[in-house]
């Protein structure tokens, strides 16, 4: 079973109306199709193929990570618009230097998947390549994906990186 936001739904509304904003899906035994388990049909996110491919990768690698969080943190996404930050580990080092918690919550740093069409198999494949080395992957000009053993672990990585990005933005604006 998987719980994902619905197509066109926003995470900020899940708390107040979960069953109107989320889709619960059951994958068939042979993995060839899924059923939506809900009183009201909510079509799953268009990024479902990426999420499922990431889960398949994690299971195949025997990783303990069971949760995939994908969100669109404004300051982190903004940083991916700067080509210099897209080079290997540049963004990680900048964000680690902002507050000590960033290295504590995200010790591997973050990988970068170059721009691809959201929901595409190519984007999923690029993300999986990065997950060999990182637990957080930025999707250039789109969002972030984090994996964790539980929801809190995955969320905390993105939240802490977002805080560091906001601090970086504020520090730069001060001159």
Predicted regions and their residues:
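Glycine-rich flexible loops
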Residues: 1-175
């Amino acid at each position: 079973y998987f719980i994902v936001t619905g197509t066109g739904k926003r995470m900020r509304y899940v708390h107040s109306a979960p069953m109107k904003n989320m889709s619960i899906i059951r994958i068939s035994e042979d993995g060839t199709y899924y059923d939506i388990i809900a009183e009201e049909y909510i079509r799953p996110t268009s990024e479902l193929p990426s999420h499922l491919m990431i889960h398949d990768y994690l299971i195949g690698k025997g990783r303990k990570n069971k949760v995939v969080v994908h969100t669109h943190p404004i300051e982190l996404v903004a940083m991916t618009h700067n080509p210099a930050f897209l080079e290997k580990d540049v963004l990680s080092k900048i964000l680690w230097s902002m507050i000590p918690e960033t290295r504590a919550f995200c010790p591997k740093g973050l990988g970068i998947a170059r721009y691809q069409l959201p929901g595409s198999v190519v984007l999923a494949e690029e993300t999986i390549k990065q997950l060999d080395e990182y637990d957080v992957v930025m999707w250039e000009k789109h969002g972030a994906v984090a994996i964790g053993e539980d929801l809190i672990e995955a969320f905390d990585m993105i939240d802490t990186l977002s805080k560091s990005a906001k601090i970086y933005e504020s520090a730069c604006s001060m001159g």
